[in-house]
């Protein structure tokens, strides 16, 4: 089944891309969720317009992503105080991407979307310094040193 994506889909493509998928995936997942439309001549012209606009926007986004990268790198290590379970150094919960975004903002950094934060594992569950990747743009990634410390 040939479809045109109306939203970014992980491991498949970006908005405006024409993709070939299995019928069941297209009919049961992509189309009902509004992530794609069936490819036709009119839809293809619309996809070309979307792609041109996306390429223009990508240049502006790349400049903005580089500015954000500079601002985040200027912060240095970001500290996140959390509740711990005794002296063992384990946490009562876990540190999520939302917690990382809040810590970056509190440290004076830009407001980010939690979906662009890539934790080293699913969640951070111990004290210490952990590298956290922030995916700002397909060409721009920045690594933040997150210091998880016990709350006083």
UniProtKB/Swiss-Prot annotation:
Looking up PROSITE patterns in the UniProt record yields: RIBOSOMAL_L9 (PS00651)
- This protein's GO CC annotations: ribonucleoprotein complex; ribosome
Q: Does this UniProt record's set of keywords contain rRNA-binding?
A: yes
- Keywords associated with the record: Ribonucleoprotein, Ribosomal protein, RNA-binding, rRNA-binding
The species this protein was found in: Mycobacterium avium (strain 104)
Keyword Cell membrane carried by entry: no
SUPFAM superfamilies for the chain: L9 N-domain-like, Ribosomal protein L9 C-domain
Q: Which GO biological process entries does UniProt record here? A: translation
**GO molecular function annotations of the record:** rRNA binding; structural constituent of ribosome
The gene designation is rplI
Question: Gene3D superfamilies, per this entry?
Answer: Ribosomal protein L9, C-terminal domain, Ribosomal protein L9, N-terminal domain
Protein name in UniProt: Large ribosomal subunit protein bL9
Q: What is the lineage of its organism?
A: Bacteria, Bacillati, Actinomycetota, Actinomycetes, Mycobacteriales
In terms of domain of life, where is this protein from? Answer: Bacteria
What PANTHER family does this protein map onto? 50S RIBOSOMAL PROTEIN L9
What is the similarity comment for this entry? Belongs to the bacterial ribosomal protein bL9 family.
Role summary = Binds to the 23S rRNA.
